[in-house]
Amino acid sequence: MSLRVNFSSEQAFLAQYQKSDYPSPLMTVDMAIFSVDQGQLQILLIQRSNYPQKSYWALPGGFVDLEQDQNLMACAHRKLLEKTGIDSPYLEQVASIGNAKRDPRGWSVTVLYFALINFKAYQQQIQHSEHSEWVTLEQALKLDLAFDHHDLLQQAFARLNNKTRYTALPISLMPPLFTLTELQNIYEIILGHNLEKKAFRRRMIESGVVEETDQSKIAGKRPAQLYRFALQDYDFNFPRMLEYPRHHED
Protein backbone atom coordinates (compact mmCIF):
# COMPACT_ATOMS: atom_id res chain seq x y z
CA MET A 1 0.00 0.00 0.00
CA SER A 2 1.39 3.40 -1.01
CA LEU A 3 1.23 6.32 1.38
CA ARG A 4 -0.03 9.65 0.10
CA VAL A 5 1.96 12.61 1.39
CA ASN A 6 0.08 15.85 1.76
CA PHE A 7 2.13 18.90 0.81
CA SER A 8 1.37 22.40 1.97
CA SER A 9 2.05 23.91 -1.46
CA GLU A 10 3.22 23.15 -4.95
CA GLN A 11 6.57 24.69 -4.05
CA ALA A 12 6.96 22.16 -1.23
CA PHE A 13 6.04 19.32 -3.56
CA LEU A 14 8.58 20.39 -6.20
CA ALA A 15 11.29 20.80 -3.55
CA GLN A 16 11.19 17.08 -2.78
CA TYR A 17 10.42 15.86 -6.30
CA GLN A 18 13.15 13.67 -7.81
CA LYS A 19 13.00 13.12 -11.57
CA SER A 20 15.27 10.12 -11.17
CA ASP A 21 12.50 8.34 -9.27
CA TYR A 22 10.70 7.82 -12.56
CA PRO A 23 12.16 6.08 -15.62
CA SER A 24 12.45 8.35 -18.67
CA PRO A 25 12.77 7.41 -22.35
CA LEU A 26 15.67 8.46 -24.56
CA MET A 27 14.63 11.68 -26.34
CA THR A 28 15.98 12.61 -29.77
CA VAL A 29 15.20 14.60 -32.90
CA ASP A 30 15.79 13.44 -36.49
CA MET A 31 15.69 15.49 -39.69
CA ALA A 32 14.87 14.46 -43.26
CA ILE A 33 16.51 17.14 -45.43
CA PHE A 34 15.42 16.99 -49.08
CA SER A 35 16.67 18.76 -52.18
CA VAL A 36 16.72 18.34 -55.96
CA ASP A 37 19.88 17.95 -58.04
CA GLN A 38 20.47 16.65 -61.56
CA GLY A 39 16.80 15.94 -62.04
CA GLN A 40 16.46 13.71 -58.96
CA LEU A 41 15.09 14.10 -55.45
CA GLN A 42 17.95 13.89 -52.94
CA ILE A 43 18.06 13.17 -49.20
CA LEU A 44 20.90 14.19 -46.87
CA LEU A 45 22.34 11.29 -44.86
CA ILE A 46 25.12 11.03 -42.30
CA GLN A 47 27.32 8.04 -41.54
CA ARG A 48 27.26 7.19 -37.84
CA SER A 49 30.69 7.42 -36.21
CA ASN A 50 29.76 5.75 -32.91
CA TYR A 51 27.95 2.68 -31.60
CA PRO A 52 25.21 1.58 -31.71
CA GLN A 53 24.97 0.89 -35.45
CA LYS A 54 28.37 2.43 -36.12
CA SER A 55 29.03 3.14 -39.84
CA TYR A 56 25.33 2.85 -40.74
CA TRP A 57 23.83 5.64 -42.79
CA ALA A 58 21.16 7.62 -40.95
CA LEU A 59 19.13 10.79 -40.93
CA PRO A 60 20.95 13.62 -39.13
CA GLY A 61 19.80 14.07 -35.55
CA GLY A 62 20.68 13.49 -31.92
CA PHE A 63 19.72 13.79 -28.27
CA VAL A 64 17.84 16.67 -26.71
CA ASP A 65 20.18 18.68 -24.46
CA LEU A 66 18.28 19.84 -21.37
CA GLU A 67 20.78 22.65 -20.77
CA GLN A 68 21.11 24.02 -24.31
CA ASP A 69 17.78 23.39 -26.01
CA GLN A 70 14.90 25.66 -25.10
CA ASN A 71 12.53 23.60 -27.24
CA LEU A 72 12.49 20.78 -29.79
CA MET A 73 12.91 23.12 -32.76
CA ALA A 74 16.05 24.59 -31.19
CA CYS A 75 17.39 21.08 -30.73
CA ALA A 76 16.66 20.22 -34.36
CA HIS A 77 18.53 23.28 -35.64
CA ARG A 78 21.47 22.62 -33.29
CA LYS A 79 21.88 18.97 -34.25
CA LEU A 80 21.50 19.69 -37.96
CA LEU A 81 24.26 22.29 -37.76
CA GLU A 82 26.51 19.98 -35.73
CA LYS A 83 26.06 16.98 -38.02
CA THR A 84 25.97 18.62 -41.47
CA GLY A 85 27.25 22.18 -41.21
CA ILE A 86 23.96 23.71 -42.37
CA ASP A 87 21.14 25.55 -40.66
CA SER A 88 17.98 25.21 -42.70
CA PRO A 89 15.69 28.26 -42.49
CA TYR A 90 12.69 25.94 -42.70
CA LEU A 91 12.01 22.88 -40.56
CA GLU A 92 8.57 21.34 -40.12
CA GLN A 93 7.59 18.74 -37.54
CA VAL A 94 6.25 15.56 -39.14
CA ALA A 95 5.59 13.10 -36.31
CA SER A 96 6.62 11.78 -32.91
CA ILE A 97 7.59 8.11 -32.77
CA GLY A 98 8.30 6.16 -29.60
CA ASN A 99 8.58 2.52 -28.61
CA ALA A 100 10.81 0.00 -26.83
CA LYS A 101 12.29 -1.50 -30.01
CA ARG A 102 13.51 1.35 -32.20
CA ASP A 103 16.80 1.87 -30.30
CA PRO A 104 18.89 -0.92 -28.68
CA ARG A 105 19.88 1.47 -25.88
CA GLY A 106 16.36 1.52 -24.49
CA TRP A 107 12.85 2.94 -24.75
CA SER A 108 13.19 5.82 -27.21
CA VAL A 109 11.16 8.72 -28.55
CA THR A 110 12.16 10.79 -31.58
CA VAL A 111 10.55 13.87 -33.07
CA LEU A 112 10.84 13.84 -36.85
CA TYR A 113 11.29 17.02 -38.91
CA PHE A 114 11.65 17.61 -42.62
CA ALA A 115 12.95 20.46 -44.78
CA LEU A 116 13.35 21.24 -48.46
CA ILE A 117 16.50 23.24 -49.20
CA ASN A 118 18.33 24.63 -52.21
CA PHE A 119 21.07 22.18 -53.21
CA LYS A 120 23.57 24.73 -54.55
CA ALA A 121 23.08 27.15 -51.67
CA TYR A 122 24.18 24.58 -49.07
CA GLN A 123 26.50 22.28 -50.98
CA GLN A 124 29.69 24.03 -49.87
CA GLN A 125 28.87 23.64 -46.17
CA ILE A 126 27.95 19.99 -46.63
CA GLN A 127 31.16 19.24 -48.55
CA HIS A 128 33.11 20.32 -45.45
CA SER A 129 31.16 17.91 -43.26
CA GLU A 130 33.13 14.67 -43.16
CA HIS A 131 30.32 12.20 -42.60
CA SER A 132 27.38 13.68 -44.56
CA GLU A 133 26.39 12.97 -48.14
CA TRP A 134 23.54 13.57 -50.56
CA VAL A 135 21.92 10.36 -51.81
CA THR A 136 18.99 10.01 -54.19
CA LEU A 137 15.77 9.11 -52.42
CA GLU A 138 15.56 5.94 -54.48
CA GLN A 139 19.04 4.86 -53.35
CA ALA A 140 18.39 5.81 -49.72
CA LEU A 141 15.26 3.67 -49.52
CA LYS A 142 17.31 0.66 -50.65
CA LEU A 143 19.90 1.12 -47.89
CA ASP A 144 19.84 -0.61 -44.52
CA LEU A 145 19.53 2.62 -42.56
CA ALA A 146 20.21 2.90 -38.83
CA PHE A 147 17.45 2.23 -36.30
CA ASP A 148 14.00 2.85 -37.83
CA HIS A 149 15.21 5.59 -40.16
CA HIS A 150 13.87 3.82 -43.25
CA ASP A 151 10.37 4.24 -41.82
CA LEU A 152 11.10 7.81 -40.74
CA LEU A 153 12.30 8.67 -44.24
CA GLN A 154 9.14 7.24 -45.78
CA GLN A 155 6.99 9.30 -43.41
CA ALA A 156 8.92 12.48 -44.18
CA PHE A 157 8.71 11.92 -47.93
CA ALA A 158 4.97 11.32 -47.70
CA ARG A 159 4.65 14.72 -45.96
CA LEU A 160 6.82 16.45 -48.59
CA ASN A 161 4.88 14.82 -51.43
CA ASN A 162 1.57 15.89 -49.92
CA LYS A 163 2.69 19.47 -49.24
CA THR A 164 3.93 19.76 -52.82
CA ARG A 165 0.38 19.16 -54.00
CA TYR A 166 -1.10 22.15 -52.15
CA THR A 167 1.70 24.61 -51.20
CA ALA A 168 4.35 26.75 -52.88
CA LEU A 169 7.16 25.06 -50.93
CA PRO A 170 9.02 23.69 -54.03
CA ILE A 171 9.57 27.27 -55.24
CA SER A 172 12.15 27.57 -52.44
CA LEU A 173 14.44 25.46 -54.65
CA MET A 174 14.32 27.93 -57.54
CA PRO A 175 16.85 30.67 -58.38
CA PRO A 176 15.61 34.29 -58.15
CA LEU A 177 14.43 34.16 -61.79
CA PHE A 178 13.00 31.06 -63.45
CA THR A 179 10.68 29.87 -66.19
CA LEU A 180 7.40 28.15 -65.42
CA THR A 181 8.66 25.08 -67.26
CA GLU A 182 11.62 24.90 -64.87
CA LEU A 183 9.30 25.27 -61.89
CA GLN A 184 6.92 22.61 -63.19
CA ASN A 185 9.88 20.25 -63.60
CA ILE A 186 10.73 20.63 -59.88
CA TYR A 187 7.15 19.84 -58.90
CA GLU A 188 7.14 16.78 -61.16
CA ILE A 189 10.43 15.46 -59.74
CA ILE A 190 9.05 15.59 -56.19
CA LEU A 191 5.62 14.20 -57.11
CA GLY A 192 6.99 11.50 -59.41
CA HIS A 193 4.54 12.13 -62.25
CA ASN A 194 3.83 14.66 -65.00
CA LEU A 195 1.49 17.61 -64.59
CA GLU A 196 -0.73 19.24 -67.18
CA LYS A 197 1.14 22.29 -68.45
CA LYS A 198 -1.79 24.68 -68.95
CA ALA A 199 -3.37 23.89 -65.58
CA PHE A 200 -0.04 24.29 -63.78
CA ARG A 201 0.72 27.66 -65.39
CA ARG A 202 -2.78 28.94 -64.65
CA ARG A 203 -2.48 27.81 -61.02
CA MET A 204 0.80 29.64 -60.46
CA ILE A 205 -0.14 32.88 -62.22
CA GLU A 206 -3.76 33.29 -61.09
CA SER A 207 -2.87 32.61 -57.44
CA GLY A 208 -0.34 35.44 -57.47
CA VAL A 209 2.43 33.12 -56.27
CA VAL A 210 4.67 34.14 -59.18
CA GLU A 211 4.91 37.35 -61.17
CA GLU A 212 6.34 38.19 -64.57
CA THR A 213 9.60 40.08 -64.89
CA ASP A 214 10.79 42.11 -67.88
CA GLN A 215 13.38 39.44 -68.65
CA SER A 216 13.42 36.25 -70.70
CA LYS A 217 15.82 33.46 -71.60
CA ILE A 218 16.25 31.29 -74.65
CA ALA A 219 14.61 27.92 -74.08
CA GLY A 220 14.78 25.73 -77.15
CA LYS A 221 14.28 27.91 -80.21
CA ARG A 222 12.40 30.82 -78.66
CA PRO A 223 12.59 33.07 -75.60
CA ALA A 224 10.78 31.97 -72.43
CA GLN A 225 9.31 34.44 -69.96
CA LEU A 226 11.15 34.66 -66.62
CA TYR A 227 9.19 34.82 -63.36
CA ARG A 228 10.00 35.39 -59.71
CA PHE A 229 8.38 34.37 -56.44
CA ALA A 230 5.90 37.07 -55.44
CA LEU A 231 5.07 36.20 -51.82
CA GLN A 232 6.84 36.23 -48.46
CA ASP A 233 6.00 32.69 -47.33
CA TYR A 234 6.75 29.50 -49.30
CA ASP A 235 4.20 27.68 -47.17
CA PHE A 236 1.38 29.45 -49.04
CA ASN A 237 -1.62 27.15 -49.44
CA PHE A 238 -3.39 26.88 -52.79
CA PRO A 239 -7.19 26.56 -52.58
CA ARG A 240 -7.10 23.21 -54.40
CA MET A 241 -4.78 20.21 -54.48
CA LEU A 242 -2.75 19.59 -57.65
CA GLU A 243 -4.59 17.11 -59.83
CA TYR A 244 -3.08 14.10 -61.55
CA PRO A 245 -2.98 14.23 -65.37
CA ARG A 246 -5.98 12.62 -67.02
CA HIS A 247 -4.02 9.58 -68.18
CA HIS A 248 -2.69 8.91 -64.63
CA GLU A 249 -3.83 5.63 -63.11
CA ASP A 250 -3.60 4.87 -59.39
From Swiss-Prot:
What positions carry the motif Nudix box? 62-85
| SUPFAM superfamilies (UniProt xref) | Nudix, Winged helix' DNA-binding domain
InterPro entries assigned to the protein according to its UniProt record, in alphabetical order:
NrtR_WHD, NUDIX_hydrolase-like_dom_sf, NUDIX_hydrolase_dom, WH-like_DNA-bd_sf, WH_DNA-bd_sf
Question: Gene3D superfamilies in the record, alphabetically?
Answer: Nucleoside Triphosphate Pyrophosphohydrolase, Winged helix-like DNA-binding domain superfamily/Winged helix DNA-binding domain
Annotated region Winged helix-like DNA-binding region: the residues are: 164-237
Residues in Nudix hydrolase domain copies: 26-157
Q: Which phenotype arises from disrupting this gene?
A: Deletion of the gene leads to a 150-fold increase of the basal level of nadV expression.
Top-level taxon: Bacteria
Free-text activity regulation comment from the record: DNA binding is efficiently suppressed in the presence of ADP-ribose (ADPR) or phospho-ADPR. Accumulation of ADPR resulting from NAD degradation may be interpreted by the cell as a signal to activate recycling of nicotinamide.
> Entry's Pfam families?
NrtR_WHD (PF21906), NUDIX (PF00293)
Query: What does the record give under GO molecular function?
Result: catalytic activity; DNA binding
Keywords, A to Z?
DNA-binding, Repressor, Transcription, Transcription regulation
Role noted for this protein: Involved in the transcriptional regulation of the nondeamidating salvage pathway for production of NAD from nicotinamide. Represses expression of the prs-nadV-nrtR operon by binding to the DNA region located upstream of the operon, thus blocking the nondeamidating pathway.
The cross-references to PANTHER family, in alphabetical order and at most eight, read: ADP-RIBOSE PYROPHOSPHATASE, SLR1690 PROTEIN
Q: What is this protein called?
A: ADPR responsive transcriptional repressor NtrR
Query: Source species, please?
Result: Acinetobacter baylyi (strain ATCC 33305 / BD413 / ADP1)
* Higher taxonomy: Bacteria, Pseudomonadati, Pseudomonadota, Gammaproteobacteria, Moraxellales
